[in-house]
């Protein structure tokens, strides 16, 4: 276990659920990225995720990572949508397999192409099963995902159990950036029962109540992204952090 994973697990002993802020490297300039990251850390975020589901530029990602690291002290974790999102300078990477993709490229081939760069750049790899829930979002389209229906928690649990048996230490349930509704608590609970690792939930979480429901259902971390980039209030982010942070 690397330093970033150890830090996150240590924080989980103090907080019920962690908050991760997602910054899309394609839509953020230096000032906005730094302002968002600085504000997210002040609001109570435990880590900054940098990435996106569309195609990106490695040099641009590296620049944004450097800008964010200058402005914050919390870990910066890459969340790449493709091999071009593997860039130097970050503290770690969600080394993910999109397990319910219909395209083998996103299950194992992109990982094989990106792995040498992860090693070269000295990135801490966080082995992650990435599961797309529902349909109609960018990640569903770009990743050729066979989206798990929102009302089918047992399917998500089966994938998560497979991830556990494959040795993955993280599962990320992704409703998608800007999703109309978040992952349902029933699905989070089912996955929590099947998977004893670090459970991340993202997509469609826009307020304290949605965050609280995900936390109470068993999420170890929730991801907030679109709300911030759309001009969402950092005060609201702070309230979300407060709603999920109780031990």
From Swiss-Prot:
GO molecular function: imidazoleglycerol-phosphate synthase activity; magnesium ion binding; phosphoglycerol geranylgeranyltransferase activity
Uppermost EC category: transferase
Pfam families: PcrB (PF01884)
The reaction(s) this protein catalyses: sn-glycerol 1-phosphate + (2E,6E,10E)-geranylgeranyl diphosphate = sn-3-O-(geranylgeranyl)glycerol 1-phosphate + diphosphate
Residues that coordinate or bind sn-glycerol 1-phosphate: 172-178, 203-204, 225-226
Top-level lineage group: Archaea
Swiss-Prot/TrEMBL cofactor(s): Mg(2+)
Cellular component terms (Gene Ontology): cytoplasm
TM stretches of this protein: none
Binding site for Mg(2+): 24, 53
A Gene Ontology biological process term: glycerophospholipid biosynthetic process
SUPFAM superfamilies to which the protein is assigned, alphabetical: FMN-linked oxidoreductases (SSF51395)
Major localisation: cytoplasm
Pathway: Membrane lipid metabolism; glycerophospholipid metabolism
Keyword Lipid metabolism: yes
Keywords from the named record: Cytoplasm, Lipid biosynthesis, Lipid metabolism, Magnesium, Metal-binding, Phospholipid biosynthesis, Phospholipid metabolism, Transferase
InterPro entries membership: GGGP/HepGP_synthase_sf (IPR038597), GGGP_HepGP_synthase (IPR008205), GGGP_synth (IPR010946), IGPS_HisA/HisF (IPR050064)
EC number: 2.5.1.41
Function: Prenyltransferase that catalyzes the transfer of the geranylgeranyl moiety of geranylgeranyl diphosphate (GGPP) to the C3 hydroxyl of sn-glycerol-1-phosphate (G1P). This reaction is the first ether-bond-formation step in the biosynthesis of archaeal membrane lipids.
Family recorded in the similarity comment: Belongs to the GGGP/HepGP synthase family. Group II subfamily.
Full protein name: Geranylgeranylglyceryl phosphate synthase
Protein species of origin: Cenarchaeum symbiosum (strain A)
